[in-house]
């Protein structure tokens, strides 16, 4: 079955070198995105073995996985994938902002799951720079959506200032 998703990083289509690996599957040489549980259980030895690692933060039914649990591993992670399971679950926005603003993460923050057209720009403003989108989404449509709104009401992880802050300065 062909992949129904494509990866857009920093506004350009990208070949995805990363593989999501479940907790029971042994890691190969390829770069792997693993669960937070596996990172805590095996992270130190995987880092010592020189594995190229990423982690996925799951949203969960009632409460998502705690981004602060990444702190001991953050310098060794190249990718943090944030799950957006349904449109109405916005915890991933806060997770991305915490990673960028409070924890200083400069690697790839990837939105996975229900990553929809009208959310891309807001996700980007919160620090997400990589998006798994449906394979039929054109790069032109993606970049057009990213520039759709020229003003924002709230401050975010990006340098754009909110309308109220611009008005009073």
Please name every model-derived segment.
Residues 109-117:
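Glycine-rich beta-to-alpha transition loops that act as phosphate-gripper elements at the mouths
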Residues 38-46, 87-99, 139-148:
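Active-site-adjacent beta->alpha loops and helix N-cap segments on the catalytic face
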Residues 126-146:
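Glycine-rich phosphate-binding active-site loops on the catalytic face of alpha/beta enzymes
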Residues 140-167:
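C-terminal helical cap(s) of enzyme catalytic domains, especially alpha/beta-barrels
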Residues 55-57, 65-71, 117-130:
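Catalytic cores of alpha/beta
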Residues 1-42, 47:
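N-terminal, charge-rich interaction modules
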Residues 43-50, 67-76:
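Acidic (Asp/Glu)-rich catalytic clusters
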Residues 31-33, 52-56, 79-81, 108-110, ...:
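Structural preference for beta-strand elements that scaffold enzyme active sites
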């Amino acid at each position: 079955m062909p992949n129904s998703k494509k990866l857009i990083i920093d506004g350009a289509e990208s070949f995805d070198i990363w593989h999501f690996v479940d907790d029971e599957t042994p890691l190969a040489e390829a770069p792997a995105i693993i669960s937070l549980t596996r990172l805590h259980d095996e992270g130190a030895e995987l880092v010592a073995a020189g594995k190229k690692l990423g982690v996925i933060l799951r949203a969960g039914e009632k409460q998502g996985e705690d981004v602060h649990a990444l702190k001991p591993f953050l310098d060794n992670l190249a990718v943090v994938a944030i799950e957006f399971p349904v449109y109405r679950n916005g915890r991933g926005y806060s997770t991305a902002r915490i990673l960028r603003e409070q924890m200083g993460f400069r690697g790839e923050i990837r939105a996975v799951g229900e990553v929809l057209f009208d959310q891309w720009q807001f996700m980007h403003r919160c620090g997400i720079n990589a998006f798994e989108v449906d394979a039929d989404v054109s790069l032109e449509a993606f970049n057009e959506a990213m520039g759709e709104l020229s003003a924002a009401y709230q401050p975010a992880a990006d340098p754009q200032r909110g309308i109220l802050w611009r008005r009073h300065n």
